[in-house]
């Protein structure tokens, strides 16, 4: 090899330092790079005891359990956010606890973990030796102000995104005569966390072994704990700092940039956690575990108001601070849905907006079983397919894509990925240039943010100014700053189809009234159907005569007991004629349903309200078969054989059976049992004591407590009811009595152990008077 002026700085005949008791358990994370073992060699030569683990072969929990004295992150190929395995999560956890040193990709992981960005430098280097200028602190303590280092990289941290908590400790100049430099070292200002982009373990790097020696002297997780005071440059070190300091290092980032950087770091860490890795999410999606979804654009076109409402769950914001810290996201969602919202926007950003993906998951669960439920939007700073897949698995129907924060290439990629999961995104714009990008993209729904995300200033005229750029088929939504009816008047005239409201809704004393006033409706627009007398169920029916008398009196449900050994159990040869009577006997004309006051189709109806309606047949009574702890196959067989319209489960059957039985299910609950108000399983819960049929009255105060726990709960009340007490018991419940949508009687209409037709008629008449 010709003499090139290169100097071999490797320890040809190394002298191993004495064993360091303070570096007795150094953990070295191997990012699948051959240089890892050069790093290992230098650490061992300096007296450290080192254990090496590949980045995908140890979990964070296992790493924590090993109680390392220092942590070193090795070089490696690829990008720190996708190829560093456990590295970023380890940095996040151990920062401030133990000293951390990163080499090459290890430094890049440090930068991204604290909110910075890594990007191409314009150079692709492999074994390039460059002159380094440094600040003489940390790893560089005691070294000459300029020294030769060896570089193997094409990526590096970017000056404009280095967060305030980090300082640039060294740099090299680009070789293109641009007088610009590349970040070669960063250091946390308070925590004992330092990184280098070059390779101190290379044989062509000067003083590499001393750099590792300086690191191994550290024993505490902070500089102060190690007797160092970094973060401010002293007069003695200023001369060694690069002569052309990066002009953007101290640039104040916009709120959007700060949030974006923080989310990038957080998502990078999350993607390394077992059970939350991209492959884990994809596996769950491939198992069809994502909740059912609805088409976002179609739901936006349905509203009981002149404009559709996108109602937002928002605990805080960067501009207003804390808004509703203690808000319960699922409870808020139900209020919005019943008030006529077409979409519920759930902010899932945790630091500035105090939301989470768990909020979205809970919101989706809270709307389960509602008719025409609102679509669910994940309001988040999305920059990765991972976040879109995570949203779909949590139950989102759409996601937000912000044009301002995405390159056209990335925006296009994310848009099409979201659509591949069945979610048409909401594409957010703020300027004419951004609107053109969204229109060219083919977005079906475009949201115009009246708030400039750089300055966070609000201009309600922003939406109006951009309307002429939008095709007529595109749904335009006005976002941000809307607080009252005057704010939306112009939008109605200009073709805006929807508005998003967050803070004003979260602060509203009466959500439904505020929404109606805001959108020009009335409190009656989304009110449920008018009050009806409760459903009447006559149980323990044992003859055709009793069934016919009950129906002609106006009963809605005729129950027959299918439980062998129970009083009143009827065999099949008795049950079949009763079934025929139920199907052939019409209800009295006075019991015909009136539908004129039912809620508009565009609204969402609570699950139990819908279920109660299903159990109220317009022209005849329904036959209910009562079962108790019997095999599912037997229940299904009897349902088909007898033509049961409804199945009642009166024992300890699994809740999930309600979804396996092809007709509505009434399920008996005691007052202390859980899941009484669980939606989308049993059609209605029946409150009763013991096994039923005992004639024992339920404790009124306890019934009231059960009803008051959930405003959407509807029940059938049983237990000791008879013609003389049923009206008084329901009336005594006061306003909570409106949640009693059915009453059930068995022994209360019997005399001497047999059904009494006069008592049946009297019971029905007493209920109809409510």
UniProtKB/Swiss-Prot annotation:
Cited function: Trifunctional enzyme bearing the Gln amidotransferase (GATase) domain of anthranilate synthase, indole-glycerolphosphate synthase, and phosphoribosylanthranilate isomerase activities.
Naturally occurring in which organism (per UniProt): Aspergillus niger
EC number per UniProt: 4.1.3.27, 4.1.1.48, 5.3.1.24
Active site per the UniProt annotation: 104 (nucleophile), 199 (for gatase activity), 201 (for gatase activity)
Protein name according to UniProt: Multifunctional tryptophan biosynthesis protein
Annotated spans, N-(5'-phosphoribosyl)anthranilate isomerase: 535-770
Annotated region described as Disordered, given as residue ranges: 228-251
HAMAP family: PRAI
Keyword set includes Isomerase: yes
GO CC terms, sorted: cytosol
Transmembrane annotation, as ranges: none
Binding site for L-glutamine: 76-78, 108, 154-155
Compositionally biased residues, Polar residues: 232-242
Domain Glutamine amidotransferase type-1: 25-225
Keyword Lyase: yes
Keywords: Amino-acid biosynthesis, Aromatic amino acid biosynthesis, Decarboxylase, Glutamine amidotransferase, Isomerase, Lyase, Multifunctional enzyme, Tryptophan biosynthesis
Matches recorded under InterPro entries: Aldolase_TIM, Anth_synth/Amidotransfase, Anthranilate_synth_II, Class_I_gatase-like, GATASE, Indole-3-glycerol_P_synth_dom, Indole-3-GlycerolPSynthase_CS, PRAI_dom
Catalytic reaction equation(s): N-(5-phospho-beta-D-ribosyl)anthranilate = 1-(2-carboxyphenylamino)-1-deoxy-D-ribulose 5-phosphate; 1-(2-carboxyphenylamino)-1-deoxy-D-ribulose 5-phosphate + H(+) = (1S,2R)-1-C-(indol-3-yl)glycerol 3-phosphate + CO2 + H2O; chorismate + L-glutamine = anthranilate + pyruvate + L-glutamate + H(+)
Pathway(s) annotated for this protein in UniProt: Amino-acid biosynthesis; L-tryptophan biosynthesis; L-tryptophan from chorismate: step 1/5; Amino-acid biosynthesis; L-tryptophan biosynthesis; L-tryptophan from chorismate: step 3/5; Amino-acid biosynthesis; L-tryptophan biosynthesis; L-tryptophan from chorismate: step 4/5
GO MF annotation list: anthranilate synthase activity; indole-3-glycerol-phosphate synthase activity; phosphoribosylanthranilate isomerase activity
Ranges where the record places region Indole-3-glycerol phosphate synthase: 255-519
GO biological-process terms attached to the record: L-tryptophan biosynthetic process
PROSITE patterns noted in UniProt: GATASE_TYPE_1 (PS51273), IGPS (PS00614)
């Amino acid at each position: 090899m010709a003499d090139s002026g290169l100097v071999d700085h490797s320890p040809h005949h190394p002298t191993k330092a004495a064993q360091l008791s303070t570096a007795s358990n150094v953990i070295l994370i191997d990012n699948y790079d051959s240089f890892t073992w050069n790093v290992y060699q230098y650490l061992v030569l300096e007296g450290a005891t080192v254990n090496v683990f590949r980045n995908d072969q140890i979990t964070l929990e296992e790493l924590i359990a090993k109680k390392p004295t220092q942590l070193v992150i090795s070089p490696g190929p690829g990008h720190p956010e996708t190829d560093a395995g456990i590295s970023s999560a380890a940095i996040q956890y151990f920062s401030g606890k133990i000293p951390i040193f990163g080499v090459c990709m290890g430094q890049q992981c440090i930068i991204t973990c604290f909110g910075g960005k890594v990007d191409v430098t314009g150079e692709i280097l492999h074994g390039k030796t460059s002159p380094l200028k440094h600040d003489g602190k940390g790893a560089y303590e005691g070294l000459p102000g300029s020294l030769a280092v060896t570089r193997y990289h094409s990526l590096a941290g970017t000056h404009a995104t280095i967060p305030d908590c980090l300082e640039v400790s060294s740099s090299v100049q680009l070789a293109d005569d641009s007088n610009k430099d590349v970040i070669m070292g960063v250091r946390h200002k308070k925590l004992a966390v330092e990184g280098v982009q070059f390779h101190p373990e290379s044989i062509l790097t000067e003083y590499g072994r001393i750099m590792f020696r300086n690191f191994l002297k550290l024993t505490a997780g902070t500089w102060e704990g190690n007797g160092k005071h970094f973060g401010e440059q002293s007069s003695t070190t200023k001369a060694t700092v690069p002569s052309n300091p990066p002009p953007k290092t101290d640039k104040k980032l916009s709120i959007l940039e700060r949030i974006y950087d923080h989310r990038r770091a957080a998502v990078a860490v999350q993607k390394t956690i077992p059970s939350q890795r991209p492959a884990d999410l994809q596996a769950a999606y491939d198992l069809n575990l994502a909740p059912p979804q609805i088409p976002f654009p179609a739901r936006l076109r349905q509203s009981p108001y002149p404009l559709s409402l996108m109602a937002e769950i928002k605990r805080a914001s960067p501009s207003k601070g804390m808004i509703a810290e203690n808000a319960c996201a699922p409870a808020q969602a139900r209020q919005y849905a019943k008030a006529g919202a077409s979409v519920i926007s759930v902010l899932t950003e945790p630091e500035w907006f105090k939301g989470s993906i768990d909020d979205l998951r809970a919101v989706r669960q809270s709307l389960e079983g509602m008719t025409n439920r609102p679509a669910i939007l994940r309001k988040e700073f999305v920059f990765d397919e991972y976040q879109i897949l995570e949203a779909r698995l949590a139950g989102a129907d759409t996601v937000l894509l912000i044009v301002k924060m995405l390159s056209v290439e990335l925006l296009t990629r994310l848009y099409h990925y979201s659509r591949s999961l069945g979610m048409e995104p909401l594409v957010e714009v703020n300027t004419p240039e951004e609107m053109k990008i969204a229109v060219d993209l083919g977005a079906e729904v475009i949201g115009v943010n009246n708030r400039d995300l750089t300055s966070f200033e609000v201009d309600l005229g922003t939406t109006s100014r951009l309307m002429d750029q939008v095709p007529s088929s595109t749904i335009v939504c006005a976002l941000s700053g809307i607080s009252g009816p005057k704010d939306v008047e112009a939008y109605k005239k200009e073709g805006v189809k929807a508005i998003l409201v967050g803070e004003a809704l979260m602060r509203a004393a009466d959500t439904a009234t505020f929404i109606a006033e805001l959108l020009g409706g009335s409190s009656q627009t989304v009110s449920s159907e008018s009050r009806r007398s409760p459903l009447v169920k006559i149980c323990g029916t044992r003859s055709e005569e009793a069934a016919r008398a009950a129906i002609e009196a106006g009963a809605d449900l005729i129950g027959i007991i299918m439980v062998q050994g129970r009083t009143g159990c009827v065999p099949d040869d008795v049950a079949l004629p009763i079934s025929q009577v139920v199907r052939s006997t019409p209800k009295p004309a006075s019991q015909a349903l009136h539908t004129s006051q039912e809620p508009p189709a565009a609204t969402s109806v609570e699950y139990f309200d819908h279920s109660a309606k299903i159990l109220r047949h317009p022209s005849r009574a329904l036959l209910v078969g009562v079962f108790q702890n019997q095999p599912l196959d037997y229940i299904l067989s009897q349902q088909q054989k007898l033509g049961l319209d409804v199945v009642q489960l009166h024992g300890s059957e699994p809740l999930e059976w309600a979804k396996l039985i092809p007709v509505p299910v009434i399920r008996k609950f005691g007052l202390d049992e859980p899941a009484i108000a669980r939606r989308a399983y049993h059609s209605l819960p029946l409150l009763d004591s013991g096994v039923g049929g005992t004639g024992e009255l339920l404790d009124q105060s306890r019934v009231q407590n059960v009803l008051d726990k959930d405003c959407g709960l509807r029940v059938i009340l049983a237990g000791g009811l008879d013609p003389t007490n049923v009206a008084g018991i329901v009336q005594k419940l006061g306003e909570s009595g409106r949640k009693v949508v059915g009453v059930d009687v068995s022994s209360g209409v019997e005399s001497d152990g047999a059904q009494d037709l006069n008592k049946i008629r009297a019971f029905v008449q007493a209920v109809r008077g409510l």
